[in-house]
Amino acid sequence: MAAPRPRSDPGSVLRDRSFIRALADLVLPPACLACDGIIDPRDTARLVCRRCRSLLRAVPHPACTRCEAPRLVTSRSDEACAECRNWPDSLTVARSACLLLPPADVIVHALKYRGWPALASLIADRMATVRLPAAVRDAAVCVPVPTTRARLRTRGYNQAFLIAAAFASRTGRSTCDVLAREGHTGTQTALQPVARRANVAGAFRFVPERAGAVRDRAVLLIDDVLTTGATAAACAATLADAGALSIGLITFARAIDARRLTQSNGAMDDR
C-alpha cells in the first residue's frame, strides 16, 4: 500500500512562489507597460511604474458641473455646455479620473488592444479616488458599458466589465450586466460627434430579467474613456427605460481637445 502523500503547506507554497517571483525579477526585471522602463520590484503595482502613475493628469478646473468638460475662466457658470447639452436628462453627471494624455492613453490602449486585462485593477484604483456628486454618491450598482459580441470574441473580455467589477469591489458596490449591445456598430474612434450619436442610436437594450437591479435606483455607468458621451448617453437612455432613477458616468480617462487646453494657457488649475 502506497504511503499517503503529505499535504502541502499553503504557507510554504506561497513562500516558494514569492521566492520564484523575486528571482525572476532579478533575472528579468518587469518593464512598465507605459514607458518600457524598469519597474522597482518592490512596487506592488508592477504593470505601470510609479513615475508614469504620477504623470496621470487630473481633469482641470473650472469645469462643467455636469460633465466636467474644462471651461475657460471667462466662461459664465450658467452658460450651456457644448459637451453635454445633447445628453438625456437621465445622465445627470460624468466624472473621470484623469485626462486621456500620456501615459493614460497608452494604458487604455494596452488594456483594450494589447491583451493586458490586469490593468483594469490599476485603472479601478485610480477611479476609486474620484469624488462623486451627491446625486450618485450613494449609487450601489455599477453597470459596465457593453461591447459587441464580435469584439468580445476578438479581445476575450469586455474591458468596461473588468473595470466595473474591480471598481465595485473597491467601493463596496455591486456589478450588474444590465445592458446588451445589438449588432456591430463599428468603432467610434474616427467619428465626429453627430456621427457618433447616429452610430449608437438603438444600439443598446436592457436585459429584462436583470432590470430589477437598477429599477428605482441611482446607477453608476462604467467605461474606460469619455469622448463625446454619445455611447454613455445611449446607455443612460436605455437604463432609464429599465427604470433607473438617475445615472452617473465614471470613466478612467476623458478625451479633451488639445486646443481647449492650449487656449486656457495655464488659466485652469488641476485639482
Can you say where each PLM-predicted feature lies in the sequence?
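Glycine-rich phosphate/pyrophosphate-handling loop used in enzymes and phosphotransfer proteins
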Residues: M1-R271
